[in-house]
């Protein structure tokens, strides 16, 4: 036992004095940290931040954005698209009816036209059209499952306007659909005037009186978009008191149009849409 104690004392002498646990260690500094060798996940310690190169990779598929609407305000003829169907064209003529005459026409039509709110059917659900309408023509006209009965009793003012449009455009018409938008809440939803009774590439002459409303158009999407209108071309045309707008060519085949509701107060507006209706679609110009 005594030999074991002696050997332990000898071994302890070689260890030297024990270090106190209270001895303070130097605090790590930013300089010390920078001198430490980083792990494999970081860069070489001698490479500066400014020397690093970041390589931007283009996405494999481009970001698709909806185009900004084209606004048409000035008088002129505009080809808005071209497709295998043909050229879609609109002609804008502000002030076609001068201000004094337009005021008189508006007052007479508000008073004399037999305006009526009709019931439409959409997705087998009936609804009240958010506007008043009237029909003039020797033939009936059916759209949105609504049939307008023949009405050959043209108001003299309407006949005068029809003749004036025909003389200035070279087009002839035999029918007229009248629309009265009573206020900002009245509207017409997206549609095309492409009923079979109108024939192929129908010409529509639209004459406006009263408050200015925005006429909007959107191009029909290609088949691969499966009816998605998100990225289609769009056109906006403000229609003022006395303005004439002609839609022709493939416009009804390739585009839709509407007059949307508005958030701000609007006075009444009358829109006259002259067109040609054929008695037998098989005899139309297809």
Curated annotation (Swiss-Prot):
> What catalytic activity does the UniProt entry give for this protein?
an N(1)-methyladenosine in mRNA + 2-oxoglutarate + O2 = an adenosine in mRNA + formaldehyde + succinate + CO2; a methylated nucleobase within DNA + 2-oxoglutarate + O2 = a nucleobase within DNA + formaldehyde + succinate + CO2; an N(1)-methyl-2'-deoxyadenosine in single-stranded DNA + 2-oxoglutarate + O2 = a 2'-deoxyadenosine in single-stranded DNA + formaldehyde + succinate + CO2 + H(+); an N(3)-methyl-2'-deoxycytidine in single-stranded DNA + 2-oxoglutarate + O2 = a 2'-deoxycytidine in single-stranded DNA + formaldehyde + succinate + CO2 + H(+)
Residues that, per the record, bind 2-oxoglutarate: 179-181, 269-275
InterPro entries assigned to the protein according to its UniProt record, in alphabetical order: AlkB-like, AlkB-like_sf, ALKBH3, Oxoglu/Fe-dep_dioxygenase_dom
Instruction: Give binding positions for substrate.
Output: 115, 141-143, 194
Give Gene Ontology CC terms: cytosol; mitochondrion; nucleoplasm
Which Pfam families does the protein's record reference? 2OG-FeII_Oxy_2
Molecular function terms, GO-annotated: broad specificity oxidative DNA demethylase activity; ferrous iron binding; mRNA N1-methyladenosine dioxygenase activity
Provide the alphabetized UniProt keywords. Answer: Cytoplasm, Dioxygenase, DNA damage, DNA repair, Hydroxylation, Iron, Metal-binding, Nucleus, Oxidation, Oxidoreductase, Ubl conjugation
Region annotation Disordered: where it falls in the sequence: 1-38
Q: How is it modified after translation?
A: Ubiquitinated; undergoes 'Lys-48'-linked polyubiquitination. OTUD4 promotes USP7 and USP9X-dependent deubiquitination of 'Lys-48'-polyubiquitinated ALKBH3 promoting the repair of alkylated DNA lesions.
List positions binding Fe cation.
191, 193, 257
Entry's cofactor comment: Binds 1 Fe(2+) ion per subunit.
Q: Does the keyword Ribonucleoprotein apply?
A: no
Polar residues: bias regions: 20-36
**Which GO annotations describe the biological process of this protein?**
cell population proliferation; DNA alkylation repair; DNA repair; negative regulation of cytoplasmic translation
- Give the sites modified to (4R)-5-hydroxyleucine: 177
Tell where it localizes.
Nucleus; Cytoplasm
Where in the numbering of this chain does the Fe2OG dioxygenase domain appear?
A: 172-278
- Give the protein's cofactors: Fe(2+)
Task: Give the enzyme's EC designation.
Answer: 1.14.11.33, 1.14.11.54
Q: What does this protein do?
A: Dioxygenase that mediates demethylation of DNA and RNA containing 1-methyladenosine (m1A). Repairs alkylated DNA containing 1-methyladenosine (m1A) and 3-methylcytosine (m3C) by oxidative demethylation. Has a strong preference for single-stranded DNA. Able to process alkylated m3C within double-stranded regions via its interaction with ASCC3, which promotes DNA unwinding to generate single-stranded substrate needed for ALKBH3. Can repair exocyclic 3,N4-ethenocytosine adducs in single-stranded DNA. Also acts on RNA.
Query: How does this chain assemble?
Result: Interacts with the ASCC complex composed of ASCC1, ASCC2 and ASCC3. Interacts directly with ASCC3, and is thereby recruited to the ASCC complex. Interacts with OTUD4; the interaction is direct. Interacts with USP7 and USP9X.
**What name appears for this protein in its UniProt entry?**
Alpha-ketoglutarate-dependent dioxygenase alkB homolog 3
The record lists the organism as: Bos taurus
Give the source lineage, highest ranks first: Eukaryota, Metazoa, Chordata, Craniata, Vertebrata
- Gene name, Swiss-Prot/TrEMBL: ALKBH3
